[in-house]
Design a protein with these regions (language model features):
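Short, surface-exposed beta-strand-loop junctions and turns on beta-sheet-rich folds
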Residues: 48-49, 525
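Hydrophobic beta-strand residues in large extracellular and virion-surface proteins
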Residues: 33, 42, 50, 501-503, ...
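N-terminal, motif-rich segments that launch catalysis or mediate targeting to/interaction with membranes
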Residues: 3-30, 34-46, 53-267, 285-438
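Active-site alpha-helical segments that house and flank conserved acidic catalytic motifs
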Residues: 265-282
Length: 545
């Protein structure tokens, strides 16, 4: 929630600025404006979190200069985990080193892991009024990427600032980790954090005031307000520019036989990989981000209402495919660690690994591939294919027109309209409760049980089947690419002299599933998918390590 006290949030005045809740603009009471010179700062809040509402200034009348902007992205901890799962190589023939164990040294003295650079790139560091994707030519975009990267790697002020940002991000990581240990879905932990971290990050990057920790905008929120680099075709342009720059640095490192320059190439590539990973977040795949800002008056209202489509696609996910023929269901921001996103996790980690491998290969060979041959691009969700085979998008392009789903509350409504207006659409969306898409699977209501006499081994084995440990199980329903959330966990079974149990797994009696995914959790660890079984199986023997 906002850092404003209740009475402040109702209406604050300071130097001809009035801070008020956006919903008050549409109430009978309205918002009192004392003079022609007053400016109104609206905080869009209500039951939604301000993480997706970035307040700014607008004149009192609707229709001009709305600056309540969405921040739409994978969360920082998610980006960190993706990057730090990568293997980095420095010596030909030697095995890769887990990225979380490697410090990448930057010119300004910062030493960061690959995942930390992925997390900081684009969201926290960049040039707010110079999106990479808006460069007119590949050379222009490469130059813009370099300037964005240098704001982290070269500017002296970034050395201390980045450490403060990462310290706050650790709260997010800790909350997600605790949710995993508790057997909860991590998106619940992100939701519970609300805006508290955004407020801290805004202040760290030069924003905030006595009236609101979110206003004025620091660099963090300015980047969020102009974030086309993180969406669809524009994220693709940003990644290609950054990967190109990193490959050029790797070739230079080869020429000089300088491992320190290879470190810099890896850091540049990690910054670029931020935009690569965004393309695996469902809320970033088909949202017409720039077009909405262009056709809605005021343009910033168009940016604001993209939040609703972003949230829909992130929550329910999209069926996606890539050039290699892989098909999977991808979810979005805050759901990377959720049990239902396991297939997407595999795909995004593989893409980032391919991206990093290409840096080392260019370091060894002294030559760089052309953009048409970048290996990670073959793994990306096909942006055009994702426009079909999914529930009806809230907004969709038809030529140069942005069409809106006719019934905003019905995700299965295929009818679209072109005579919609920004403000009236916002009023429909701000409290809407969309239904569930066709094919949605409800979670099971029962848990697996362990057969009392079904233990398969009396021999302990590393790393988890050990006396003093404990294990429990849950399962989800599946049907093609669709999967439900997991149902309740069984009680922990203490391990002493018996290991590797036989499970009774409840069958589906009405959800329309064709199979089930079985999950296991050792005490203190995170849930893991251990098996997929058909709809008729009633038992499973856990012989997994």
């Amino acid at each position: 929630m906002s850092g404003l006290h209740t009475q402040q949030r109702e209406q604050l005045q300071h130097k001809s600025q009035i801070v008020a809740d956006l919903d008050s603009l549409f109430s009978e009471r309205g918002i009192a404006i004392s003079g022609d010179g007053d400016h109104l700062m609206l905080i869009a809040d209500g039951h939604h979190t301000i993480k997706y509402h970035k307040p700014g200034i607008l004149p009192a009348a609707p229709g001009k200069n709305l600056k309540a902007l969405p921040q739409l992205r994978f969360e920082g901890g998610e980006h960190t985990a993706i990057g730090d799962a990568t293997l980095l190589r420095f010596v030909k023939g030697a095995p890769g080193i887990p990225a979380w164990q490697v410090e990448l040294h930057l010119p300004n003295g910062l030493a960061l892991s690959y995942g930390q650079v992925v997390a900081l790139g684009g969201d926290f560091y960049g040039i707010p009024d110079q999106p990479i994707c808006e460069g007119a030519t590949p050379a222009d975009r490469l130059q813009r990427f370099t300037a964005a990267f240098n704001s982290l790697a070269v500017l002296p002020a970034a050395k201390d600032e980045a450490k403060q940002i990462l310290a706050v991000m650790q709260k997010e990581i800790a909350a997600a980790n605790q949710a995993l240990k508790d057997g909860r879905q991590p998106h619940e932990a992100y939701d519970a954090l609300g805006d508290t971290l955004s407020e801290e990050w805004n202040k760290i990057t030069g924003g905030g005031s006595f009236a609101s920790a979110l206003f004025p905008l620091g660099r963090y929120l300015k980047l969020a307000a102009n974030n086309a680099d993180h969406f669809g075709e524009w994220a693709l342009l940003a990644y290609v520019a950054g990967h190109t720059a990193a490959l050029q640095q790797a070739v230079l490192a080869h020429k000089n036989a300088d491992e320190k320059q290879l470190e810099l190439a890896y850091a540049m590539n990690a910054f670029a990989d931020h935009f690569l990973t965004d393309l695996f977040s469902a809320g970033h795949v088909r949202v017409p981000r720039k077009q909405l800002a262009a056709v809605v008056t005021p343009s910033d209202l168009g940016s604001l209402i993209t939040r609703f489509m972003h949230d829909e696609d992130s929550k329910f996910g999209l069926n996606v495919s890539n050039a290699q023929g892989d098909r999977w269901h991808a979810y979005g921001d805050k759901r990377y660690f959720d049990t239902i996103d396991s297939n997407n996790r595999k795909q995004v980690k593989l893409a980032v690994q391919r991206s990093a491998d290409e840096i080392f290969e260019s370091y060894l060979s002294g030559t760089a591939p052309t953009p048409g041959n970048f290996t990670a691009l073959k793994l990306l969700p096909d942006l055009n294919a994702a426009k079909s085979g999914n529930f009806s998008p809230l907004f969709v392009m038809q030529g140069d027109k942005v069409l809106r789903r006719s019934d905003v509350n019905n995700l299965n409504d295929t009818k679209t309209i072109d005579n919609w207006w920004g403000w009236s659409t916002y009023l429909l969306l701000k409290d809407y409760k969309p239904n569930k898409p066709a094919g949605y699977l409800e979670a099971p209501t029962l848990a697996p049980s362990i057969q009392a006499n079904g233990w398969q081994s009396q021999t302990p084995s590393e790393p988890n089947w050990l006396p003093g440990n404990a294990v429990r199980y849950a399962f989800s329903y599946t049907n093609g690419l669709n999967e439900s959330y997991i149902g309740p966990w069984s009680a922990y079974a203490e391990l002493s002299e018996r290991f590797q149990p036989t499970l009774n797994v409840p069958v589906d009696t009405g959800s329309g599933s064709s199979g089930r995914n079985l999950f296991r959790q050792f005490r203190g660890g995170s849930p893991e998918l251990i098996a997929s079984i058909d709809k008729t199986a009633t038992t499973y023997i856990d012989r997994n390590a």
